[in-house]
A protein has these predicted regions:
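Glycine-rich beta-strand-centered segment in the early N-terminal region that forms part
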Residues: 19-34, 43-84
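Residue-level marker of beta-strand positions
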Residues: 25, 32, 57-59, 76-77, ...
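Glycine-rich cofactor phosphate-binding loops and adjacent beta1-alpha1 units
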Residues: 178-252, 258
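C-terminal capping/lid region of NAD(P)-dependent oxidoreductase domains
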Residues: 196, 285-305, 312-333
Length: 333
C-alpha cells in the first residue's frame, strides 16, 4: 500500500505492507484523509532522515474486524482519528476506541475531518462554558472555524475574529454570525454585548506569530474569565494582568482524554463512562452527530479532493497561506 511520509524536509510516497488484523482493531480501506495544515507543515519542516508518517484524520470502509470489536462490522463506513494508527495511507489498522460509524446522512469526505472535529470539541469542553456565555474565537483557520461553529450550535454568544477578510467572510457566510476583521471593532462589540464586563472565554486559535494575543485575551476577558490556547501560540501572559483579573489559563490537548495513552489506544481499553464522560472516541462520535443533524456545516471548507501524488504541492499551497482553503482532502478512491 502507498503511504505519505516526510523525510529531510521533503514529502515521500513509500510502499508499506498492508497491516494484519489483530484483536480489538479494525482494518480500514481508506476513502479520504484530511490534512491538518499547522501540524503537518511543522512535521515536514522538522523531519530528519527517518520517515515520519503524516496525517491523523480519515474515513473509509471497515474490511476486517478483530476479536473484541462489537460496534463495527465489515462493510461499515467508519471515521477514525489518531496517529500513529491513522495516517495518509491506503489502509489503516485502528483500535476500536478510535473508530466510529458514519451514518447515512454524512458523506465520507465530511467525516474525514473527524479528528479535527474532536480536537475542536475538546477545546470547548476544556473551557466549561455554559449556554448564553460569551466566547471570543481568535483565528479562523480550520480549528477556529470548527470551534466557532460548535460553540454557536451550543447557544454560546460567539464573537469570531480573524485579521484576514476571506476567512472572516467564510465563517459569517456559513453561520450568519457577525464576524470581525478589525480588532478595535471586535472590542467595541464585545463591550456592547457584555455590558463592559468582558468575555467568559477566549479561544486562541491563531499561529505562533500571534503570541501577543495571549496578553490581549486577558484584556478581552471578564474577571475570572478563561483564556484557552488551541493553536501553536507561544504564550506571553503578563502576571499583573493575570493577578488583577484572576484569569484562568488553559491549554487544550488534542481530541480529549485517551489521546497518547497506550491503555486507551494501543490496548483499546475504554475509560469508564461514568468517570470519563467525554473521551476522544466519544468526542469523535459527537462531531459525527453534529454533522448528521446538520448542526454544523463543513462542506464549504472542502474543495475537490486531491490525489495522493498531489500532497506536496497541496502543502506548499497551505503553507503559503491561501486564505480561501483551510484544509485539503486526499482521495484514495
Amino acid at each position: 500500500m502507498k503511504s505519505i511520509c516526510a523525510a529531510k524536509g521533503e514529502i515521500c510516497i513509500i510502499e508499506k505492507e498492508i497491516p494484519k488484523i489483530k484483536d480489538n482493531f479494525i482494518l480500514v480501506k481508506t476513502s479520504y484523509t484530511a490534512i491538518s495544515p499547522g501540524t503537518e507543515i511543522t512535521m515536514l519542516k522538522n523531519s530528519k532522515e527517518e520517515y515520519v508518517s503524516l496525517g491523523y484524520s480519515a474515513s473509509g470502509e471497515a474490511v476486517e474486524v478483530g476479536s473484541g470489536v462489537e460496534h463495527i462490522k465489515p462493510g461499515d463506513r467508519v471515521a477514525c482519528y489518531g496517529a500513529p494508527y491513522v495516517s495518509h495511507s491506503e489502509y489503516l489498522l485502528v483500535p476500536k476506541t478510535l473508530c466510529v460509524i458514519i451514518p447515512q446522512n454524512v458523506s465520507s469526505m465530511e467525516a474525514s475531518l473527524v479528528g479535527l472535529g474532536a480536537i475542536a470539541i475538546h477545546a470547548l469542553r476544556q473551557a466549561h462554558l455554559q449556554f448564553g456565555e460569551i466566547a471570543v474565537v481568535s483565528g479562523l483557520g480550520i480549528f477556529g472555524q470548527l470551534i466557532g461553529q460548535i460553540a454557536n450550535a451550543s447557544a454560546l454568544k460567539v464573537i469570531p475574529f480573524n485579521n484576514t477578510e476571506k476567512r472572516a467572510e467564510l465563517f459569517e457566510k456559513i453561520t450568519g454570525v457577525k464576524t470581525f476583521v478589525e480588532e478595535e471593532k471586535m472590542e467595541e462589540y464585545l463591550d456592547l454585548i457584555s455590558r463592559g464586563k468582558g468575555a467568559d472565554g477566549v479561544f486562541l486559535c491563531a499561529g505562533r506569530s500571534a503570541g501577543y494575543q495571549t496578553n490581549k485575551s486577558m484584556e478581552w476577558l471578564r474577571h475570572r474569565g478563561k483564556s484557552i490556547i488551541v493553536g501553536d501560540i507561544e504564550p506571553h501572559y503578563d502576571r499583573n494582568l493575570m493577578f488583577d483579573k484572576e484569569i484562568q489559563i488553559m491549554i487544550s490537548k488534542a481530541g480529549g482524554p485517551g489521546r497518547y495513552d497506550k491503555i486507551y489506544e494501543l490496548q483499546a481499553i475504554d475509560y469508564p463512562y461514568g468517570y470519563v464522560r467525554w473521551t476522544e472516541g466519544r468526542n469523535m462520535e459527537e462531531f459525527i452527530r453534529l454533522l448528521d443533524e446538520n448542526r454544523i456545516n463543513v462542506k464549504d471548507y472542502m474543495k475537490e479532493p486531491i490525489k495522493i501524488t498531489d500532497v506536496e504541492s497541496a502543502l506548499v499551497e497551505l503553507q503559503l497561506g491561501n486564505q480561501e482553503e483551510l484544509t485539503k482532502i486526499i482521495s484514495y478512491l
